[in-house]
Amino acid sequence: MGKRKKNDESSSSSSQKPCVSSSSDDFSVSFVRAEEDDVATTIRDKTASLKSNATHFSAASAAKGGMFDFRCCRSLFSRRRVLHSRTVRVGYGPVGHDANVTFTPNTVCNQKYNIFSFVPIVLFQQFKFFLNLYFLLMACSQFIPAIQIGAPITYWGPLGFVLTITLIREAFDDFVRYLRDRDLNSEKYEKLTRDGTRIEIRSADIEVGDVIIMHKDRRVPADVVLLRTTDKSGACFIRTDQLDGETDWKLRIPVPHTQHLPNEADIMELNCEVYAEKPQKDIHAFVGTLKITDDDNVQDGSLNVENVLWANTVVASGTAVGIVVYTGRETRSVMNTTLPESKVGLLDLEVNNLTKLLFCFVLVLSSVMVAMKGLDNLWYRYLMRFILLFSYIIPISLRVNLDMAKLFYSWQIGRDKHIPETVIRSSTIPEELGRISFLLSDKTGTLTKNEMHFKKIHLGTVAFSSDAFEEVGQHVRSAYAGRLAKHSFSAKLQNAVEAIALCHNVTPIFENGEISYQAASPDEVALVKWTETVGVRLASRDLHAMSLSVQLPNGQTLMKQFQILYVFPFTSETKRMGIIVKDETTDEVTLLMKGADTVMSGMVQYNDWLDEECSNMAREGLRTLVVARKPLSQAELEAFDRAYHAAKMSISDRSQNMANVVNRMLERDLQLLCLTGVEDRLQDQVTTSLELLRNAGIKIWMLTGDKLETAICIAKSSGLFSRSDNIHVFGNVHNRTDAHNELNNLRRKTDVALVMPGSALNVCLQYYEAEVAELVCACTAVVCCRCSPEQKAQIVQLLRKYRAPLRVAAIGDGGNDVSMIQAAHAGIGIDANEGKQASLAADFSITQFSHVCRLLLVHGRFCYKRSCALSQFVMHRGLIISTMQAIFSCVFYFASVSLYQGVLMVAYSTCYTMLPVFSLVVDRDVTATNALTYPELYKELGKGRSLSYKTFCIWVLISLYQGAVIMYGALLVFDADFIHVVSISFSALIVTELIMVAMTVHTWHWAMLLAQALSLGLYMISLILFDQYFDRQFVLSWVFISKTTAITAVSCLPLYIVKALRRKFSPPSYAKVN
């Protein structure tokens, strides 16, 4: 014993070959031999009397780091680009000081790595995680003879397996990106040369200043200023769904000077220079100018976003010719491509915490073993060797198992026929779906269909609903026929209908003999379709003119032509749109405007009915728009034209200057024509879905930008507010005192469904953020109206801050929901007809709201429960073998000798047990039907009982018990040769692990049976082939089988009995419904 304490230790068993380093260190070799001799002489003396304790583990999942490393490498090894404006000349490229500037190439590169950086970056990404770094250090320590434990393959094998899978996955993903990039860079386009001829050019070879030709249904390869189209009117429609997610066609206008040229070759003969601002991210703004010099004549013109085609948009009509102003990384599409922050699931964080506990346990257990052995000058070597021996407590394969499981969950959700076209865009957080406590939902397009139907028009003195629209048509036709006085009621109705038919951005498209309408908003399409039903049809529209087809009482058709002078498009900031038209029959010039009542009420002449009727319509659940007009004299038009042109030519603050001119000169003293009401119908099965989610313990909040009355109406009709709810509407809050009073009023009520305007929310959060979180979260349902996109995200952050660790999900369908979706723990986007922004930004994409029930209650449950079981079994697998190792060391005087050698240790966690444990990802504790029928089952998941410190301790105790039984049992029943201890204990260990998996299964699947059979068969073959580890004659005897069976029965039977009794006398909820 004294000699052994003075020397360093190595690993071996008496009948196993010692793994000694090839180093010539005589001290180390002599120590190993001495240690082996002592172990061999002590085995028979210490087979009956010892007990030991062990531990349990979990591996840390890390989802946040990869993108950071990618950014780091780019920032370290790439030169910072300086963005600046540029002036390009048609046919000559950049001119002036820009002629010497090297602009970014037009190559598309989405690859993370190149051939040299691939291995270093991937390895860096992996070893920055503590778990992988820990195992790397353990593996490297095996090259030090003094602390070597067994064969290096024991430690390098699992680490190499994990790294190989990671490298293969990353290489495959990057190769797919490379192929996609190569296809885009190799696309062919036509370029105009100085002499006007066309040549073919690759997309990657396009440069700033090139004049290129883009045909219909082709991708725009760079940001170009539109010079000419084949459409006679000069209209060019583009699809922007790959840029901003919106599926409606956008109208783009070429430069008038070049559009009027006879053919495209004439463009190259112009002395034309285009100035473009420095590259920026805003896809809705562009500042530029165009200058054409012809002898002594200089023509200047302004350029805005309507004159530009952004890269990655698609030409939807005709052929376009444009000059390239931005390429490559300076294009709007690339500058708006941000790497979203990776989300980390709560389960991953819990597993990470358990991993830290296990690491601490390894240190404590190793320290105890060293202390029990006795401290001397070489204690640190003993400590290192014990840490190496017990390193299996921290299973390196856990992270790989969880990552593979997440990919399987994503595949399974994607092919669920009950929720078709569901897309998983973030495969790292499927378990989050199983623990949602708050669901924040948009209204329009999410709870409602975003299919608008015109329902009501109010003219101040009389209102017409859908059942009286035929009467409206009679009035309008009579007015156009000229039978009534100018100021009669019919004439007023005519003016209102005509204004609705003209004030929009709708374009009729004729395809295959049918007419369809393209517009940015479904509200506008609903209005135009309604005017058609009452006899005023939008016949045609181009950049400069619009025609209406009016049905007269005698059956004839009257065509009215209007010249479009100016269009002021709708934005979410202005909440209105306007148009100035000139009637070509009467030469009357009129400004027509429509918009939200909140902004239009301050622009129209005094009236006593607008606010009241807006509230009435909102209570009916209708979306309202105020329509108004203002006749303009020629002098007023000319004055506006001069001021507006001057604002358009400004380089800085152009948009603001233009808006100021419009507001100052036009948006005053408008004549109120009518108030329109459009209905947005509820999505299919919304009411039953909300009830199902509420029964599942999920609190549902509706966040909308609509009016208070409309929001309340939809909340009631959808079932968000139940009949028993006491609806509390927040009053006007302007200051801290108001907020304090309103919050006190709310505090005194119970079973409250809260309605809070966005303005009140802002004030309350400014002064009483914590109190708002406490009181609002206690409400049964919450509706926030007049909510901006920023406020939606702010509400999500409020819940995340004050209700952690409860999980928050957000669901929406539009661009205004993106910030909310990205801020939530789980973002769900609805793939809407009008746009894909929310769908593309979300973690999960569905096609309708009702699908969220199956996504959460079925797939969310399965993902969470399966990952919990998988994590605990991987930890159990490492704990049980470490328990056996600890007992083995204690029996033999705390020797740091490995119980199992080389291939056995590697195969234990891979070939023999990996498939059965991983097969738990197809287990189901309840059927999908029962999960939806009994939504109350979902409530229990939020408590986190499937993986908690309690369950962790239970599995630790199970591992300690089974490890002790197997190890002590093997020592008790073996006869003479120590190799029999290895055979019996390792066989009992493998069979116990397979039986434990089988005992955990709730619903058997063919993949589980196959995994069990393959693993058991592979191990039985190993018993025959690995004669260096097993005595072939012994393992084929009945003695071996009986001893192994007995030990396995003692380790598993008591646990089975306890489980059976528990299911009989205290069954879990899922067992009751089954």
From Swiss-Prot:
Active site annotation, chain numbering: 442
Topology term for the membrane: Multi-pass membrane protein
Predominant place of localization: membrane
Cellular localization per UniProt: Cell membrane
GO process annotations (BP): embryo development ending in birth or egg hatching; endocytosis; phospholipid translocation; reproductive process; retrograde vesicle-mediated transport, Golgi to endoplasmic reticulum
Reactions the enzyme catalyzes: ATP + H2O + phospholipidSide 1 = ADP + phosphate + phospholipidSide 2
Cofactor(s) annotated in UniProt: Mg(2+)
Family matches, as InterPro entries: ATPase_P-typ_cyto_dom_N, ATPase_P-typ_P_site, ATPase_P-typ_TM_dom_sf, ATPase_P-typ_transduc_dom_A_sf, HAD-like_sf, HAD_sf, P-type_ATPase_IV, P-type_ATPase_N
Residues holding ATP: 442-444, 524, 570, 575, 594, 623-624, 704-706, 786, 792, 816-817
Ranges in coiled-coil conformation: none
Low complexity: compositionally biased ranges: 10-26
EC primary class: translocase
Keywords assigned by UniProt, alphabetized: ATP-binding, Cell membrane, Lipid transport, Magnesium, Membrane, Metal-binding, Nucleotide-binding, Translocase, Transmembrane, Transmembrane helix, Transport
Pfam families: Cation_ATPase (PF13246), E1-E2_ATPase (PF00122), Hydrolase (PF00702), PhoLip_ATPase_C (PF16212), PhoLip_ATPase_N (PF16209)
E.C. code: 7.6.2.1
Region (Disordered): 1-26
Residues that, per the record, bind Mg(2+): 442, 444, 813, 817
GO cellular component: cytoplasmic vesicle; endosome; plasma membrane; trans-Golgi network
Entry GO MF terms: ATP binding; ATP hydrolysis activity; ATPase-coupled intramembrane lipid transporter activity; magnesium ion binding
Membrane spanning stretches: 118-138, 143-163, 354-374, 378-398, 886-906, 954-974, 978-998, 1006-1026, 1038-1058
Family: Belongs to the cation transport ATPase (P-type) (TC 3.A.3) family. Type IV subfamily.
PANTHER family attached to this UniProt entry: PHOSPHOLIPID-TRANSPORTING ATPASE (PTHR24092:SF5), PROBABLE PHOSPHOLIPID-TRANSPORTING ATPASE (PTHR24092)
Record function comment: Plays a role in regulating membrane trafficking of cargo proteins during embryogenesis. Regulates snx-3 retromer-mediated endosomal sorting of mig-14, a transporter of Wnt egl-20 morphogen. Together with mon-2 and pad-1, may participate in the formation of endosomal carriers that direct mig-14 trafficking back to Golgi, away from lysosomal degradation. Required for Wnt egl-20 gradient formation along the anteroposterior body axis and migration of QL neuroblast descendants toward the posterior part.
UniProt name for this protein: Probable phospholipid-transporting ATPase tat-5
